[in-house]
């Protein structure tokens, strides 16, 4: 077959020179770079999943339930229990990971001539998804401590009048939390909708923005995922919680039968076993405290985190430091922020290997 490159294709001009998103996938012993839950699913969950797939396999010649009604019922029950906010399936929408959730929201509320504003550094897919939907992305820098500078944030929202504002809490890659009071201040000055990205909410003791949904029915959407605390990254299931009108909106842009029968069934099984799965959250939180304390003891600067990862520095060359960890068999994440790296909290043995490497690397003055 004739070899060609992207430059030979009639690609959209704004995509030329861009790079595909993705964390490095390398064959190393210790992988702490993608914020997965390191604990495998329980034997009971696996057995339930196998039995469920066996049951539905004879129906795979048929399209799946178009609107994932049963799954949304289960998600609503989970959110009601986990946050204390009573919701029904009419408040829930599910898709293939929170990235598809965010993409659908941008398709419905962004687009040509519209803008989305976010506080950087934050989740790197926000500007990528904005570009893919022809939504102009406005980046507002966080403060030196990586927290949202509220005076700057409110001033920029008033000046730029964005159609969409992203607030990620706990924030990725820094791990800090934006208080509900500050979320409300943002909602009250934002002219359009505010998407609160709570991908890591289960790791945080802070209250969920879902508690504000009744107060701001036309402006607030809370996005979540089952990829992190739920130990379900391979299942690719994201969802949002909002007023039912928002579900009506994304139904205008969603693809038909977007969630496969297997995805729906697997997610329902995972929700049935949520008590077991989320039982690992406390273990990871304890490990996060231990890892952060040891890093500080070694002389690193650590950003306070309420998630399943730790953001730390200061390096003069963070990529050289990343390579030094990799040379020691530990894969962590260089997210492109000067002087800093991010490590996912793994099982104790993985964290020990990371900390042993960190103890050696601090001496290199990288």
From Swiss-Prot:
Name of the coding gene: hisC
Protein EC: 2.6.1.9
Q: Which PANTHER family does this one have?
A: HISTIDINOL-PHOSPHATE AMINOTRANSFERASE, HISTIDINOL-PHOSPHATE AMINOTRANSFERASE-RELATED
Extract the InterPro entries matched here: Aminotransferase_I/II_large, HisP_aminotrans, PyrdxlP-dep_Trfase, PyrdxlP-dep_Trfase_major, PyrdxlP-dep_Trfase_small
Q: Which UniProt keywords apply?
A: Amino-acid biosynthesis, Aminotransferase, Histidine biosynthesis, Pyridoxal phosphate, Transferase
For the keyword Amino-acid biosynthesis, the answer is yes
Q: Name one Pfam family in it.
A: Aminotran_1_2
Q: Which family does it belong to?
A: Belongs to the class-II pyridoxal-phosphate-dependent aminotransferase family. Histidinol-phosphate aminotransferase subfamily.
Pathway(s) this gene product operates in, as recorded in its UniProt entry: Amino-acid biosynthesis; L-histidine biosynthesis; L-histidine from 5-phospho-alpha-D-ribose 1-diphosphate: step 7/9
| Complex formation | Homodimer.
Annotated GO MF terms: histidinol-phosphate transaminase activity; pyridoxal phosphate binding
Annotated positions of the N6-(pyridoxal phosphate)lysine modification: 228
The entry's protein name is: Histidinol-phosphate aminotransferase
Q: Does the keyword S-adenosyl-L-methionine apply?
A: no
Which organism was this protein described from? Corynebacterium glutamicum (strain ATCC 13032 / DSM 20300 / JCM 1318 / BCRC 11384 / CCUG 27702 / LMG 3730 / NBRC 12168 / NCIMB 10025 / NRRL B-2784 / 534)
Q: Which SUPFAM superfamilies match?
A: PLP-dependent transferases (SSF53383)
**Catalysed conversion reaction:** L-histidinol phosphate + 2-oxoglutarate = 3-(imidazol-4-yl)-2-oxopropyl phosphate + L-glutamate
**Cofactors that this protein relies on:** pyridoxal 5'-phosphate
Please provide the Gene Ontology terms (biological process) for this protein. L-histidine biosynthetic process
């Amino acid at each position: 077959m004739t070899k060609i490159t992207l430059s030979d294709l009639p690609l959209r001009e704004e995509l030329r020179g861009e790079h595909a998103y993705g964390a490095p996938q390398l064959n190393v012993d210790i992988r702490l770079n993608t914020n997965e839950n390191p604990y495998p699913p329980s034997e009971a969950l696996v057995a339930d999943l196998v039995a469920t797939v066996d049951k539905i396999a004879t129906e795979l010649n048929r399209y799946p339930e178009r609107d994932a009604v049963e799954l949304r019922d289960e998600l609503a029950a989970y959110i009601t229990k986990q946050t204390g906010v009573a919701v029904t399936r009419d408040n829930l929408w599910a898709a293939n990971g929170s990235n598809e959730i965010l993409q659908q929201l941008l398709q419905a509320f962004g687009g040509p001539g519209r803008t989305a504003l976010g506080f950087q550094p934050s989740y790197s897919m926000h500007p990528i998804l904005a570009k893919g939907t022809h939504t102009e992305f406005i980046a507002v820098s966080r403060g030196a401590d990586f927290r949202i500078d509220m005076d700057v944030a409110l001033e920029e929202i008033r000046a730029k009048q964005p159609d969409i504002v992203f607030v990620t809490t706990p924030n990725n890659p820094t791990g800090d939390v934006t208080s509900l009071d500050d979320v409300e201040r943002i909602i009250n000055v934002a002219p359009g909708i505010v998407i609160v990205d709570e991908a890591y909410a289960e790791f945080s003791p802070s209250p969920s923005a879902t508690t504000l949904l009744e107060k701001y029915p036309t402006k607030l959407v809370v996005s979540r995922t089952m990829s992190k605390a739920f130990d379900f990254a391979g299942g690719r299931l994201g969802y949002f919680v909002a007023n039912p009108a928002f579900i009506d909106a994304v139904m205008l842009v969603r693809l038909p039968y977007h969630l496969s029968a297997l995805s729906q069934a697997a997610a329902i099984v995972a929700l049935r076993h949520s008590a077991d799965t989320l039982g690992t959250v406390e273990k990871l939180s304890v490990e996060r405290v231990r890892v952060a304390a040891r890093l500080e003891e070694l002389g690193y600067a650590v950003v306070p985190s309420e998630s399943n990862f730790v953001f730390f520095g200061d390096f003069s060359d963070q990529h050289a430091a990343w390579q030094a960890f990799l040379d020691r068999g530990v894969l962590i994440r260089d997210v492109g922020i000067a002087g800093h790296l991010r490590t996912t909290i793994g099982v104790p043995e993985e964290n020990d290997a990371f900390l042993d490497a960190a103890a050696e690397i601090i001496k290199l003055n990288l």
